[in-house]
Amino acid sequence: MGVMAATSREHTRTYFLGKLARELETRGLEAVLRTDPPTLRITDPDTAMVSETVDCVALADGWFYRFSWGDVVESTDNPAAAADRIRHVLVTSSPNRDA
């Protein structure tokens, strides 16, 4: 892969992760965009012990958000649904908070 293709792919990831970050923030979560490689570090400010890192990958059917353990979250076409799923995972993982 050439430098231009790699740069374009990183720009695409950053763009989609930025859209997801905005959706997460409207749901009361904190999302920090990391650039190398592009990922989102997501935390619930009420339970800082619980966090998740999400990245963005190109698959045969398009671009998708992906949990750190490799499961696909949702298509990048639907960042709102992805944010809902991520919030559900974070909130239900918290030892001190009800969903």
For each feature predicted by the language model, list its residue ranges.
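Negatively charged, low-complexity tracts enriched in Asp/Glu with abundant Ser/Thr
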Residues: 1-42, 72-73
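Short, intrinsically disordered, low-complexity terminal/loop segments
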Residues: 2-3, 97-99
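Glycine-rich loop at the start of a catalytic domain that most often binds anionic cofactors/ligands
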Residues: 43-48
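Intrinsically disordered, low-complexity regulatory segments enriched in Ser/Thr/Pro
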Residues: 50-76
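Ampiphathic alpha-helical segments that act as solvent-exposed interaction surfaces
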Residues: 71-98
